[in-house]
């Protein structure tokens, strides 16, 4: 939901989560970020599904204050030994994403992906992959550049456009014109703006 940078993600504290509202959604206060050097803070949307997952995580970890995303000590077999009170280190975020992809593959959630392709995908994942992916998902859903920048706190449109350049064409002027023409396709009717 939030498209947080890794430095923002590891700083999320229980007190920063507001909600849920009557729809089950919430919002996250982001006190400081790369694009907010003055520390004025910003907010991000939290969906009902995210709010539910956060509620479960906080309950399971018995977290009432402090960092939401804490270090977890595990036994050799991978079972949880202890949920610590220390925040995750920013460098661990990318490794967690890689582990999630491997687990999804093991559970058959990535289709017929072979081991070679899996390793190529895992190697390409970084802590920034979520931000790139959220931009691409929004372009694929034909969200506007301005809406994407506002929702995920980007200041430079060139950055967002670079992440979604291949997908942005689907919502561009040419694509919109083609849709209008297809809707008006009857004989020699000229394509024109339809509101």
Where are these regions (language model features)?
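Short, basic (Lys/Arg/His-rich) helix/loop patches that form interaction surfaces
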Residues: 63-64, 94-150
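C-terminal secondary-structure termini that scaffold catalytic or DNA-interacting sites
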Residues: 177-195
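Nucleic-acid-interacting cores, centered on viral/eukaryotic replication and modification enzymes
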Residues: 6, 26, 130, 138-141, ...
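Mobile genetic element proteins and their domesticated derivatives, centered on retroelements
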Residues: 3, 9, 30, 69, ...
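Short, charged phosphate-coordinating catalytic segments
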Residues: 1-24, 145-150
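Basic, alpha-helical nucleic-acid-contacting "clamp/cap" segments
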Residues: 20-105
């Amino acid at each position: 939901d939030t498209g947080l940078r890794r430095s923002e993600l590891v700083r999320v504290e229980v007190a920063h989560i507001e909600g849920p509202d009557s729809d089950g959604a919430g919002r996250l206060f982001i006190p400081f970020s790369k694009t907010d050097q003055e520390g004025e803070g910003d907010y991000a949307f939290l969906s009902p599904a995210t709010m539910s997952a956060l509620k479960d995580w906080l309950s399971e970890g018995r977290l009432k204050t402090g960092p939401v995303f804490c270090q977890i000590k595990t036994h050799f077999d991978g079972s949880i030994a202890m949920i610590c009170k220390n925040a995750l280190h920013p460098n661990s975020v990318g490794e967690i994403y890689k582990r999630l992809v491997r687990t999804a593959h093991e559970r058959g959630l990535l289709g017929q992906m072979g081991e070679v392709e899996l390793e190529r995908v895992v190697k390409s994942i970084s802590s920034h992959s979520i931000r790139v992916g959220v931009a691409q998902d929004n372009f694929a859903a034909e969200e506007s550049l301005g809406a994407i920048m506002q929702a995920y706190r980007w200041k430079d449109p060139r950055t967002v456009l670079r992440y979604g350049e291949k997908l942005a064409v689907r919502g561009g002027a040419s694509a919109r014109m083609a849709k209008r023409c297809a809707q008006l396709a009857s004989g020699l009717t000229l394509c024109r703006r339809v509101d």
